[in-house]
Design a protein with these regions (language model features):
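Glycine-rich phosphate- or other oxyanion-binding loops that anchor nucleotides, phosphorylated ligands
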Residues: 1-147
Length: 147
């Protein structure tokens, strides 16, 4: 994924939860599924919007932790546990978990604002506004489709 690309989560997971000592899969919290699955209607609608507007995107797994990803070691760690991960961030799985608990449909999208490279802090500051604007534009088009 490159800066400016969009990831639509078909599912989300935590990549910093470790209850394996209690017999759980890595990433799974007690009483919760390992993956929180997005509403397929929402995923398909976003896929349509992104294709129509020629925005490079992928559909797939987004993982969440409580810390900013910077450095090769963290990237390797996440990939070892979730090899199919498309993006990592700090909020999505919590949103998905809340929607799951409330039995509400959801989807999470991410416009890539940085990579987990060594200079991620600098890249994030440079591109966070651009990524946010793109996410907002995509969301507005998505809402038009649902209307």
């Amino acid at each position: 994924m490159a800066i400016g690309d969009v990831v639509v989560a078909d599912r989300l997971a935590y990549h910093d939860v470790d209850l394996t000592a209690f017999g759980y899969e890595f990433g799974r919290m007690s009483g919760q599924p390992l993956f929180f699955k997005s509403d397929q209607t929402f995923v398909s609608a976003f896929e349509e919007v992104l294709a129509k507007h020629h925005i490079h995107s992928k559909i797939g797994l987004i993982t969440t932790s409580d810390s900013f990803m910077a450095g090769k070691e963290k990237t390797i760690f996440v990939k070892e546990h979730f090899p199919e991960v498309q993006a990592v961030e700090m909020e999505g799985a919590a949103i998905a978990q809340a929607a799951y608990a409330a039995k509400r449909p959801f989807v999470v999208i991410r416009s890539i604002s940085d990579t987990a490279a060594h200079d991620a802090n600098i890249t994030f500051e440079e591109f966070v506004v651009k990524a946010g604007k793109q996410s907002a534009q995509v969301l507005l088009k998505f809402l038009e489709i649902l209307d």
